[in-house]
């Protein structure tokens, strides 16, 4: 059997972190060798529940749906696993959520296996099962209900996909972490007792109490369903123990049965119980809702008391703890989600964005690194998987030894860990109204986004895409989208008729403010539909203070509720504005008419190519610490930041602190998808090609090394981009081969975070040659993992366009 290191083909010595145990290595191989199939079981059970309970309030209908699924779905315990719990009928299969939509599923039944990337397999039996339930869901789904709420004024944006809202209309809870600490300390019994007391105190003459009454009943149903799910594993593990091939396996299965009889209903007392409790909840949340970015929160903080107690009592060793952690991470990769073909352009690699956060500071502002922080690093290094998404919270006092260990993991070349910076995130949260003690307890929840675990509402990011380069083209074209020919904004003048750069700036501001308002209208309509149609009970029950308020998350039950969209093409906007200002209006080397013609024709012909070369070679570029380009994009971005802050979300004034919007640059792989529909841009980019991702520079436009990139990024209004400022960098593995090189990188990171107040950074440590070879010989690189955006994915499951985008990124040296 090959080891992870041998399959990955990396030159880095993973002996530094040791290897998986034989059984976990086999488990990992079995999971990765398994083809992902479409699974209709959940959809069939959900249909049955919706039909039987169609007259009930939606909160009860949703509760009975989850009960039906958990009590009847297929269960299994893998022969190598120490943990029980599965999302679908088989590992890595993708369940279907018809209450959100069946439309794309039915349209693509015969296409899933033919995709360029994100391939899924499907049997004829599954196709028939899905077709058989389709009539019930035809108009009875979230997508349909959201569609009828959308005002006529925004239909053009939905028809053209301008705001990229498909994922929001097809998806459930996202970008949050429930209160795992409370789950472990109190068990679901503690939540149940609180609900019982809250229901007993209701004044049913108060009209608001009626919805609360049904919400509380739905929580009782859900908790009973979770208990039934766990007890089914008690029976299964006991049955398997009777047929176990060895005495050791028999004892392990009996221990699984004992633990499942206890958690998550009762508090956890050991590390094994804590892991099982967390996994049950993590798994069931992704059975309840078609979401993503459901994250583990500050794992090393709430788990450490159990680790410490077990080590002191001799119940566990460091090796046994690491093995159980690797088991949990392999379990995490079994969770899967199918998206429509068009949606995969923005979420390439079937990512679930399940984040684990370690490090950072305690609530009393001390370094939070503990022995478990190191064991998480070690276990993630051993499993070498794209999930979970590992984030380290950096702060000025971060333990130096721990920082060294983080770089050693990074050298393994699978894009982890990413770093978020306490020095900018905590003050930004406090400025937005988050209590200081909660701000110090934040975690990553998805890619680069952050929130307070167990207290933050639904979807703190991931709302509208705002394609800045396309907005610029619409501005230049007098409010008309050049790609579709449809009017997207009022007419503020055509670029060909402009006499100064100031005219363009004025038109940009008016157009961007208009489109921002339109995005808010779309978001609000979809959020209203989500609130009405698909309340998620377990997720709400485990988030403070939904029980206290008697409201689910989408009604405003969380303590905090902030949301942001995703702004795409930051660098393209910067470079385009710099080229227009310098080459057209300052130097006069191009007329507005010439530039516009070149854009319309995608730089065709000899003159077009010459103009393209001029734009690329002779204009200032973002990413080089050049104030000319950097300040232009900051000023242009500030307009969006100012406008989006004017509009509260649908939970504003209904309980949560916040209820407002802010900006964010976590564009995932939308730079590829959004680029497909964007014509040529004034930075020299060709039509249909990827945009720049996150806040990273355009490919190979950053000529002055990594330090200059960091300085350019730091000029963005980071303290206002609270939804995340995502920076990807790529370095050759040989760059980190020596100890002195590693220390150079650490010094660079500390400078970026301490002095420049950077928000986030992550690295692809892989050579261009390896990536090209993986395209040509995918069978030799099954385990090659790359950082796509704020998440990692297996290179071979990505579409060719996304692979090319990653290959094209600038490769830095230190």
Where are these predicted regions, by residue range?
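Conserved catalytic cores of very large enzyme subunits
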Residues: 2-216, 252-255, 259, 263-814
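A conserved hydrophobic secondary-structure block that centers on an alpha-helix together
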Residues: 240-248
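Extended, structured, electrostatic nucleic-acid-contact surfaces
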Residues: 238-239, 307
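Secondary-structure-rich domain cores
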Residues: 230-238
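Extended non-globular scaffold/tether segments
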Residues: 217-231
């Amino acid at each position: 059997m090959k080891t992870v290191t041998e399959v990955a083909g990396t030159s880095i010595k993973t002996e530094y972190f040791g290897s998986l145990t034989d059984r976990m290595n086999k488990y990992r191989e079995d999971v990765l060798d398994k083809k992902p199939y479409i699974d209709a079981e959940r959809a069939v059970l959900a249909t049955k529940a919706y039909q039987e309970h169609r007259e009930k309030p939606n909160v009860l209908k949703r509760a009975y749906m989850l009960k039906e699924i958990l009590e009847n779905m297929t269960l299994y315990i893998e022969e190598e696993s120490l943990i029980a719990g599965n999302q679908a009928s088989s590992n890595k299969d993708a369940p279907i959520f018809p209450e959100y939509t069946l439309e794309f599923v039915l349209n693509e039944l015969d296409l899933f296996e033919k995709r360029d990337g994100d391939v899924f397999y499907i049997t004829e039996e599954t196709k028939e099962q899905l077709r058989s339930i389709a009539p019930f869901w035809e108009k009875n789904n979230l997508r349909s209900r959201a569609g009828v709420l959308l005002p006529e004024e925004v239909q053009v944006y939905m028809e053209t996909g301008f705001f990229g809202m498909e994922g929001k209309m097809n998806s459930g809870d996202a970008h949050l972490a429930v209160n795992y600490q409370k789950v472990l300390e109190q068990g679901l019994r503690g939540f149940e007792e609180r609900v019982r007391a809250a229901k007993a105190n209701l004044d049913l003459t108060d009209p608001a109490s009626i919805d609360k009454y049904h919400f509380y009943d739905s929580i009782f149903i859900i908790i009973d369903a979770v208990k039934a799910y766990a007890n089914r594993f008690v029976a299964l593990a006991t049955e398997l123990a009777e047929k176990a091939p060895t005495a050791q396996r028999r004892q392990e299965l009996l221990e699984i049965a004992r633990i499942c009889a206890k958690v998550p209903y009762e508090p956890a007392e050991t590390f094994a119980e804590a892991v099982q409790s967390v996994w049950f909840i993590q798994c069931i949340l992704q059975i309840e809702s078609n979401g993503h970015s459901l994250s583990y929160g500050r794992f090393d903080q709430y788990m450490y008391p159990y680790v410490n107690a077990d080590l002191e009592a001799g119940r566990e060793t460091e090796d046994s703890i690491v093995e159980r952690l690797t088991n949990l991470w392999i379990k995490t990769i079994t969770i899967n989600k199918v998206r429509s073909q068009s949606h995969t352009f923005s979420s390439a690699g079937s990512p679930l964005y399940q984040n684990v956060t370690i490090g950072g500071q305690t609530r009393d502002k001390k370094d939070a690194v503990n022995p478990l922080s190191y064991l998480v690093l070690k276990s993630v290094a051993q499993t070498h998987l794209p999930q979970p998404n590992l984030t380290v919270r950096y702060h000025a006092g971060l333990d130096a030894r721990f920082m060294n260990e983080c770089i050693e993991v990074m050298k393994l070349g699978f894009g982890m860990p990413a770093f978020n910076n306490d020095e900018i995130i905590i003050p930004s949260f406090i400025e937005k109204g988050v209590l200081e003690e909660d701000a110090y307890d934040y975690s990553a929840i998805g890619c680069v986004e952050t929130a307070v675990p167990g207290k933050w509402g639904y979807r703190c990011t991931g709302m509208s895409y705002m394609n800045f380069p396309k907005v610029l083209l619409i501005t230049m074209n007098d409010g008309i989208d050049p790609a579709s020919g449809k009017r997207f904004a009022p007419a503020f003048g055509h670029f060909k008729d402009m006499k100064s750069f100031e005219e363009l700036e004025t038109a940009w501001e008016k157009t961007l403010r208009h489109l921002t308002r339109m995005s808010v209208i779309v978001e609000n309509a979809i959020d209203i539909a989500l609130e009405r149609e698909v309340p998620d009970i377990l997720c709400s029950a485990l988030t403070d203070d939904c029980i206290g308020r008697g409201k689910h998350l989408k009604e405003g039950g969380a303590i905090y509720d902030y949301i942001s969209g995703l702004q795409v093409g930051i660098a393209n906007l910067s470079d385009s504005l710099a080229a227009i200002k310098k080459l057209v209006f300052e130097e006069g080397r191009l007329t507005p008419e010439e530039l516009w013609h070149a854009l319309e024709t995608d730089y065709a012909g000899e003159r077009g190519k010459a103009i393209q070369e001029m734009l690329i070679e002779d204009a200032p570029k973002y990413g080089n610490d050049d104030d000319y380009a950097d300040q232009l994009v900051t000023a242009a971005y500030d307009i969006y930041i100012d406008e989006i802050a004017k509009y509260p979300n649908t939970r504003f004034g209904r309980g949560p602190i916040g209820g407002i919007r802010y900006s964010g640059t976590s564009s995932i792989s939308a730079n590829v998808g959004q680029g497909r529909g964007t014509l040529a841009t004034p930075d020299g980019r060709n039509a249909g090609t990827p945009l720049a991702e996150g806040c990273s520079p355009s490919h190979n436009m950053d000529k002055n090394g990594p330090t200059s990139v960091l300085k350019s990024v730091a000029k963005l209004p980071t303290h206002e981009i609270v939804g995340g400022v995502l920076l990807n960098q790529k370095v050759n593995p040989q760059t980190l081969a020596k100890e002195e090189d590693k220390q150079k990188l650490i010094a660079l990171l500390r400078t970026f975070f301490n002095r420049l107040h950077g928000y986030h950074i992550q690295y692809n440590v892989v050579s261009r040659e390896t990536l090209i070879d993986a395209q040509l010989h995918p069978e030799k690189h099954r385990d090659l993992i790359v950082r796509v955006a704020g998440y990692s994915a297996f290179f071979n499951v990505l579409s060719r366009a996304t692979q090319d985008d990653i290959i094209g990124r600038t490769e830095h040296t230190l």
